């Protein structure tokens, strides 16, 4: 155990930047104002700015222990577009471990507004088999569904849609999923886990 602890890379999971409630309020107002500057955006449904600092203590039954600090900064806004009696809403959100990596309030607000405007005039299409391009915002939901489906308990209980796919390829060759817990400043990054 002590050998492992001697070779820990610094994954930069903790930013000790301190943010006051007033600064968070100002960020929320800025991201909202940026969304409202987009032509066709009539209101913002909500804007948020937050930061958190955490201290994690990790202990296993075999005596291994480790502790580390982590941080998170985030901003988000939801914008409502209106044109010719049609209303649409969309949002943007960004979070980062380090404040310096957080996208600007202007960028987040403008993207939320632009996304809402782009939805105006959208319509439902007929059902059918067709190529689909997913917005990167849903990648986490897709991956979460997959992880739930490949979990041992789900497969053993027979409730997984992949229960009969053991040993079979389930994705196209072009789709690659990497599990790398040591990405610098990554949300899922950590030096140790419970296994």
Regions found by a protein language model. Give the residues of each.
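Active-site bordering "gate/hinge" segments
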Residues: 1-194
């Amino acid at each position: 155990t002590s050998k492992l602890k001697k070779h820990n890379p610094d994954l930069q999971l903790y930013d000790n930047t301190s943010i006051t409630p007033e600064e968070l309020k100002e960020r929320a107002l800025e991201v909202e104002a940026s969304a409202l500057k987009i032509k066709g955006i009539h209101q913002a449904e909500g804007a948020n700015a937050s930061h958190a600092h955490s201290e994690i203590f990790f202990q296993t039954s075999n005596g291994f222990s480790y502790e580390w600090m982590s941080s998170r900064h985030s901003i988000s806004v939801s914008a409502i577009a209106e044109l010719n009696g049609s209303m649409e809403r969309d949002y943007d959100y960004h979070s980062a471990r380090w404040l310096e990596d957080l996208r600007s309030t202007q960028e987040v607000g403008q993207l939320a507004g632009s996304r809402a405007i782009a939805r105006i005039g959208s319509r439902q299409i007929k059902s059918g088999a067709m190529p689909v391009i997913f917005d990167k915002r849903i990648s986490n939901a897709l991956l979460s569904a997959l992880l739930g489906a490949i979990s041992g308990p789900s497969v053993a209980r027979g409730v997984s849609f992949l229960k009969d796919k053991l040993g079979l390829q389930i994705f196209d060759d072009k789709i690659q999923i990497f599990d790398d817990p040591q990405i610098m400043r990554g949300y899922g990054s950590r030096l140790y886990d419970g296994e």
